[in-house]
Regions:
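Bacterial Sec-dependent N-terminal signal peptides
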Residues: 1-21
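Accessory carbohydrate-recognition regions in carbohydrate-active enzymes
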Residues: 20-321
Length: 321
């Protein structure tokens, strides 16, 4: 009986209970359903995949520690970063992952030190758009994905503001290119079953010049270097921002080469977060709308379309443009 009550609470708490107009099947979807899970007890073992149907890459707010299969749990209260993920389940774990995290004030890289408190009341999660307020840094993060890329928008306070790029700890490389407002690199992080030469190459294109740069090797932040190649590489770049100032970042990756990652970046076109989210919403409505369900109980519709959303995340596209 206790387990049934817990399951009911999990499902109810994961729905967005605010009244809203349903204009398409994607409005029934809650990516948070099934996320109140842990190693000892599963209520779904899901994570909120911010993605397009069958996309090559997904994005997820990361509450779990680096390498933890339970990358997002509903009862967590801190976000460590926003991770590109390819994870099918917590038991299989992830591969080719790296993370981005906006911070303010003191420069930090460590995943615990950079983590920020958040509330579900200040979180919007849909398949095509994610938004959250990071209270400790006073930063709003927004994400809109395409199949191989994503647009980020950070709204910063009046402060010294930074973006951390963490390529994780299985052998990685990160390079800051200030003249191009760009960061490139690769991660080899995986959980097995990959080729010997496996790499996920990534590129981040910013719309604002850097006023601070540092390379990070195994936790050591070095402002005299622009690149790091080590077991655990990363970078921190920064800006002096005014209250409400927005910094846009366009991110793409490739399993083929750095040059291909740059090509995949073109998938975003010239659209901003709002425009890319609108296109993603249409894609989701087109796919989910292939099956029309009628029911007088809105919770049944929410359950059906939330499950259908999960069904069309895989198999993922494994080809590049």
């Amino acid at each position: 009986m206790k387990k049934l009550a817990l399951l009911a609470f999990t499902l109810l708490s994961a729905w967005n209970m605010d009244a809203k107009t349903i204009t398409g099947p994607v409005d029934y979807v809650s990516p948070l359903v099934g996320t109140q899970s842990k190693h000892a007890l599963s209520t779904g073992n899901t994570y909120p995949a911010i993605a397009l149907p069958w996309g090559m890459n997904f994005w997820v707010p990361q509450t779990g520690k680096m390498g933890d299969g339970w990358t997002y749990t509903y009862d967590a209260d801190k976000i460590r970063g926003f991770k590109q993920t390819h994870q099918p389940s917590p038991w299989i774990n992830d591969y080719g992952q790296f993370a981005i995290m906006p911070i303010t004030g003191k420069v930090v890289f460590d995943q615990d030190q950079r983590a920020s408190w958040f509330s579900h009341k200040a979180e919007t999660a849909t398949p095509y758009y994610y938004k959250v307020y990071l209270a400790d840094h006073d930063v709003v993060t927004e994400i809109a994905p395409t199949e191989r890329a994503a647009a980020f928008r950070f709204t910063f306070p009046d402060n010294d503001s930074y973006v951390v790029v963490d390529a994780f700890d299985n052998g990685s490389f990160v390079k800051v290119i200030p003249s191009e407002n760009k960061i490139i690199g690769y991660t080899t992080k995986n959980s097995g079953g990959v080729p010997e030469n496996f790499k996920n190459y990534f590129v981040l294109q910013f719309d604002k010049p850097f006023t601070y740069t540092a390379a990070v090797a195994n936790g050591n932040i070095d402002t005299n270097k622009l690149e790091a190649k080590d077991k655990h590489a990363g970078a921190v770049i920064g800006f002096k921002t005014n209250k409400g100032e927005q910094v846009n970042v366009r991110v793409a990756s490739s399993f083929i080469s750095p040059e291909q990652a740059e090509l995949n970046l073109k998938e975003l076109g010239s659209g901003n977060v709002d425009q890319i989210a609108a296109k993603g919403r249409k894609v989701w409505n087109d796919v989910l709308g292939r099956i029309e369900v009628e029911d007088d109980d809105i919770d049944h519709l929410r359950t059906f379309y939330s499950c259908l959303y999960r069904s069309v995340l895989f198999p993922r596209s494994f080809y590049e443009i």
